[in-house]
Every structure is written in structure tokens, then in C-alpha cells.
């Protein structure tokens, strides 16, 4: 008999894994706060901004695939939050439009992974509470002064390109360790789309420099 997701009760694909009830626990290296969930954006403590370390790992079925899914979702949500907070901070209309376009692309990627692996993410991981949002945003854009009307634009592009390249390379690595099949296809497609994001950012960066 086919298994079903305990949250949405949809039938699972034979080769898939349901992440609905999977929770990890992290402990902040600085203040000791414990945090529980499927992912924590940027691995930061929402109380003090310190770095979290894994305190309780997943020990259920198919831990190898679950670890790959968890890492992929974390990369996508990290980029999602980068574009979301960048949109809110910048006063440049062109940069905001570029960040908004990529924000929605990352939103689609998260929805695709959610559909396939049934994470049923806590809405607070996407729409962070105010204090958590401030901590994550300050950490993401550390060293970038958004008060400089044009001074911040190049720095935002450069930081986004570095992060997108890192994400693209990691998705390729994940695809390469998976056997042929739908899981490998998912990560190969995500890698290709992240590469497209790099191209968009590089084009906009070049246009900004040449204007």
C-alpha cells in the first residue's frame, strides 16, 4: 500500500521521501538558544544572531536523501531571503526590480521542492518575524551601506552573484551524487536555473557599470 503524507494526505511517489514531520534541533554557539525546524535561514540564532550548530540530527529512514533535500531547501531559502530583504532596503528602482524578479523565481523553486518532498515549512521561515528578520538582514548585508544611493548597488550585485554561483555549484554536486532518476533531474534543473540567475545578475551589473 502506498504511503501518504501525514500533513496533506497525498500519496507519495515510490522513490520520494516525506519531510513533513522531520525536525532538526540547533544550538546557538553564542547564547545557547535551542531552535527547532526543518531549516534555519543562514543558520543564525534568532535571539542574538550567533551561529547555530546542529544539536540533534535526523535518524529516520533514508537519511542520505533527507540530508540532500534539507540542504537544497536551505540554499533556496537563503537566496529567497537575500532578495526579499534586498528589495526592502534598496532605493534604486532598477535594482529593486531585478531583486523582485529573482525573489519570485526562488519562491517558485521552494514551492517545487515543497510539492515533491512535503516539507510543509513553517510560514515563519519565509516571512520571518520582525526581530528574526532584522538579525538575518543585518547579517546578510553586513558591510553594505544602503544609505549610499548608488554605492550599494554594485556590492549587492557582487554578493548575489557569489551566492548564486555557490548555490549552482552545490546543486550540481548534489545531482552528481544521486542515481539517474527524478531526484537527480530536480537538482540538475535547479542548478541550471541558478546559473540563469547568475547570468541575469551579471548582465544587470554590466549595464549598471556602463550607464
Located regions from the model:
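Non-heme di-metal
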Residues: 1-211
Amino acid at each position: 500500500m502506498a504511503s501518504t503524507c501525514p500533513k496533506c494526505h497525498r500519496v507519495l511517489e515510490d522513490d520520494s521521501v516525506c519531510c513533513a514531520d522531520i525536525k532538526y534541533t540547533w544550538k546557538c554557539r553564542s547564547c545557547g538558544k535551542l531552535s527547532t525546524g526543518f531549516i534555519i535561514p543562514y543558520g543564525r540564532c534568532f535571539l542574538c544572531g550567533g551561529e547555530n550548530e546542529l544539536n540533534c540530527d535526523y535518524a529516520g529512514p533514508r537519511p542520505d536523501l533527507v540530508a540532500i533535500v534539507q540542504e537544497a531547501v536551505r540554499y533556496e531559502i537563503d537566496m529567497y531571503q537575500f532578495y526579499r530583504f534586498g528589495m526592502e532596503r534598496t532605493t534604486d528602482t532598477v535594482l529593486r526590480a531585478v531583486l523582485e524578479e529573482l525573489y519570485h523565481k526562488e519562491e517558485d523553486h521552494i514551492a517545487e521542492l515543497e510539492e515533491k518532498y512535503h516539507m510543509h515549512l513553517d510560514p515563519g521561515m519565509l516571512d520571518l518575524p520582525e526581530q528574526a528578520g532584522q538579525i538575518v538582514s543585518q547579517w546578510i548585508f553586513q558591510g553594505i551601506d544602503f544609505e549610499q544611493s548608488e554605492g550599494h548597488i554594485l556590492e549587492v550585485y557582487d554578493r548575489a552573484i557569489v551566492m548564486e554561483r555557490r548555490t549552482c555549484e552545490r546543486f550540481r554536486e548534489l545531482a552528481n551524487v544521486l542515481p539517474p532518476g527524478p531526484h537527480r533531474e530536480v537538482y540538475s534543473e535547479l542548478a541550471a536555473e541558478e546559473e540563469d540567475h547568475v547570468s541575469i545578475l551579471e548582465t544587470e551589473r554590466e549595464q549598471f557599470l556602463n550607464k
